[in-house]
Amino acid sequence: MRFSSPHFRNVAIGAAAVLWLAGAAQAAEVHVMISGGLSAAYNALVPEFEKATGNKVITAYGPSMGTTVNAIPTRLDRGEPADVLILVGYALDDLVKKGKATSRVDLVNSKIGVAVKAGSPRPDISTADAVKRALLAAKSVAYSDSASGVYISTEMFDKLGITADMKDKAKKIPATPVAEIVAKGEAEIGMQQISELKAVAGVDIIGPLPESLQKVTVFSAGIASASKEPEAGKALIKFLASPAARETIVNSGLEPIEGTAK
């Protein structure tokens, strides 16, 4: 998927340059830890920021929560370098409470989607009852180990009255995009943030969960308490929250939260 155009690149570079001149005096290495929900748009936008500012952005990827080796809280506990943290909003709040982060800027809203292997039959998911039937009929179901998966496994299955039915067929997928598992044929149905599903080839996204089952997740950015380049980090956050980033964010399947760039 193409996230940029010549016009967008010019606007983005100009916006990033203005932000940088306002926020920092010299080029720096900016260490970022980011979870999967915003990563596709982020990966498309970072080169524009680097061109405009001369900064080098070094990125580590991992879930917003949990204890896996790549999880952002685990990385911070290991003392890995971090200037900017981009993850689920309430997970960032937890890091602020623990003294690991110092701020929060809400960037996007993200909805959960449903996917099947490319070319496979597309079950009806238009209503809660339809989703229930699709899940019960599926031989295997996959969900993530981050925010969407926590909701699906602890709330949505219970709401549908299928927790017992899902016990053996539904699997939490750690440290791997759910869409990759679906594309390989290892799960018949996959559920994760739409932006994460869109980033993987080999799947068909049926659509978002119906509103009665939907769980909108806010992805936010903050400065790490141990940051060595807080001003450069703030400039990056301002750029990601600016109008220049909007087209790329929307194309990745996310909804920008307006008015957060400061």
Task: Name each region found by the language model.
Residues 1-13:
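Bacterial N-terminal signal peptides that target proteins for export
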Residues 4, 15-17, 34:
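Terminal low-complexity, poorly structured segments
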Residues 86:
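Phosphate-/polyanion-interacting regions in eukaryotic proteins
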Residues 23-27:
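Sec/Tat signal peptide C-region and signal peptidase I cleavage site
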Residues 11-22:
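Bacterial N-terminal signal peptides
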Residues 28-70, 74-81, 89-97, 102-110, ...:
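Exported/periplasmic ABC-transporter solute-binding proteins
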